Amino acid sequence: MDIKQLREKSADELKAHLTDLRKEQFSLRMQQVTGQLPKTHETRRVRREIARVKHLLGSTQ
């Protein structure tokens, strides 16, 4: 998701999105450990999006 789209969301929506991203990150980690992750770049994408959301949550408070 683009930073512009994230800025349009409310704090509650960002927190919900962060929860979803962390679940996705956990799932990707498990797939990577078991050797079932075909697209390794997804872990990097999720990690960066988590950082974007956390940055926006910190700046709005």
From Swiss-Prot:
GO molecular function ontology, one term from the record: structural constituent of ribosome
Question: Cross-referenced Pfam families, in alphabetical order?
Answer: Ribosomal_L29 (PF00831)
- Gene3D superfamilies recorded for this chain? 1.10.287.310
Query: Which GO terms fall under biological process for this protein?
Result: translation
> In which domain of life is the source organism classified?
Bacteria
Sorted UniProt keywords: Ribonucleoprotein, Ribosomal protein
Where does it sit, as one GO cellular component term?
A: cytosolic large ribosomal subunit
Query: Is the keyword Glycoprotein in the record?
Result: no
Record-linked InterPro entries:
Ribosomal_protein_uL29, Ribosomal_uL29, Ribosomal_uL29_sf
NCBIfam families noted in UniProt: L29 (TIGR00012)
Similarity comment: family membership = Belongs to the universal ribosomal protein uL29 family.
Could you tell me what this protein is called? Large ribosomal subunit protein uL29
Which gene name does the record give?
rpmC
